[in-house]
Amino acid sequence: MKLFILTIILLAFCSTIKAQTCDEIMEHVKSLGDGTTYTSCDGDVISKVTFYGEMINCYEYHFALVCFKQENPYDCSEYVYLVESSTETVYSTNYIANAGQAFLDFIKPHSNNLGCAPNFD
């Protein structure tokens, strides 16, 4: 039931912003402002995660932009996730101990919501 409701919300979101690609969705999310960023300097996989929120037609949408580290320390591969409202809270309380595990536990389960996440399988 939760997935069904999230799918309906996602459809409303996509029709409202008329974004067709993951890059367009990401650019729209970035245009929402600064967001709240959690940086992981010591992690092997996650460089930073930035959370954004937006209200559309009386529904609040929550996004996480995740930067995965690359060989060049100044670069990262960025992906957008549509997450639940509680995701930022649980991620922020767990990322200092292990950002990679916090990502796996709290953000990765939302990988299929937008279809913009990398495939880790």
Language-model-derived ranges and their functions:
Residues 91-121:
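C-terminal partner/receptor-binding element of secreted or periplasmic proteins
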Residues 15-19:
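Sec/Tat signal peptide C-region and signal peptidase I cleavage site
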Residues 20-26:
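Cleaved targeting-peptide boundary
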Residues 73-84:
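A short macromolecule-binding patch
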Residues 53-65:
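Short acidic, Gly/Pro-enriched loop/turn segments at secondary-structure junctions
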Residues 3-13:
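Sec-dependent N-terminal signal peptides
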